[in-house]
Amino acid sequence: MKIIIQRVKKAQVSIEGQIQGKINQGLLLLVGVGPEDQEEDLDYAVRKLVNMRIFSDAEGKMNLSVKDIEGEILSISQFTLFADTKKGNRPAFTGAAKPDMASDFYDAFNQKLAQEVPVQTGIFGADMQVELVNNGPVTIILDTKKR
């Protein structure tokens, strides 16, 4: 899995002009699933995401997790994180998991996350418009194959 983590003051995702998911303070996740991803990748990602201390404490130090601040997560599927840009000018996406596998894996990921913190999502495979107000900005890349 490859996940772009953005600390946000608020974020929302819309599909065809209708709001699909909306959060206040928390994390916006862009989630890519790879063909080799297993349940251990999912468990690792969830554990890291809910416990990662990237929110400021009273002294301004990044010392609090999304769980600590009672924040929320907006999770967006993003197969383009597996883009291969080595040849030509058009990215290839053959490094991403096949849609059926990726959809099931993404759903399982969101269900596990929701056991820890409130989660809103987009719709897998839909054309989505994402709006966010970055907080910091703080942007972190999590790759479950690099641990």
UniProtKB/Swiss-Prot annotation:
InterPro entries registered for this protein in UniProt: Daa-tRNA_deacyls_DTD, DTD-like_sf
UniProt superkingdom: Bacteria
Primary enzyme class: hydrolase
Coiled-coil regions listed in the entry: none
Sequence motif Gly-cisPro motif, important for rejection of L-amino acids, location on chain: 136-137
A Gene Ontology biological process term: tRNA metabolic process
Catalytic activities: glycyl-tRNA(Ala) + H2O = tRNA(Ala) + glycine + H(+); a D-aminoacyl-tRNA + H2O = a tRNA + a D-alpha-amino acid + H(+)
GO terms for MF: D-tyrosyl-tRNA(Tyr) deacylase activity; Gly-tRNA(Ala) deacylase activity; Ser(Gly)-tRNA(Ala) hydrolase activity; tRNA binding
Record note on domains: A Gly-cisPro motif from one monomer fits into the active site of the other monomer to allow specific chiral rejection of L-amino acids.
Protein name: D-aminoacyl-tRNA deacylase
